Amino acid sequence: MLNQIIARKKEHIQTLQLPVDGHFERRSFKEALMNPHRSIGLIAEVKKASPSKGIIQPNFDPLQTAKA
């Protein structure tokens, strides 16, 4: 039984290997973000304050900041 598990795991690992030349097709970052087939184009962080700088934006509106 253990030998079967090991054999299946080895097969699975082989499917995860890099291509022979080690290169992947390069894509445009902008095109990847604007792809209509994806629901999320960008994940961003907006902050009112920083631990080292304190308040960055006193009148903080996260939605407006994210849209800007």
UniProtKB/Swiss-Prot annotation:
**This enzyme's EC code(s):** 4.1.1.48
Which chemical reaction does it catalyze? 1-(2-carboxyphenylamino)-1-deoxy-D-ribulose 5-phosphate + H(+) = (1S,2R)-1-C-(indol-3-yl)glycerol 3-phosphate + CO2 + H2O
> Which pathway does it operate in?
Amino-acid biosynthesis; L-tryptophan biosynthesis; L-tryptophan from chorismate: step 4/5
Q: Which Pfam families match?
A: IGPS
Q: Which GO terms describe its biological process?
A: L-tryptophan biosynthetic process
Q: Which UniProt keywords apply?
A: Amino-acid biosynthesis, Aromatic amino acid biosynthesis, Decarboxylase, Lyase, Tryptophan biosynthesis
UniProt enzyme class: lyase
What stretches pass through the bilayer? none
Q: InterPro entries of this UniProt entry? A: Aldolase_TIM, Indole-3-glycerol_P_synth_dom, Indole-3-GlycerolPSynthase_CS, RibuloseP-bd_barrel
A GO term for molecular function: indole-3-glycerol-phosphate synthase activity
Question: Which family is this protein grouped under?
Answer: Belongs to the TrpC family.
Entry protein name: Indole-3-glycerol phosphate synthase
Organism the protein comes from? Bacillus pumilus (Bacillus mesentericus)
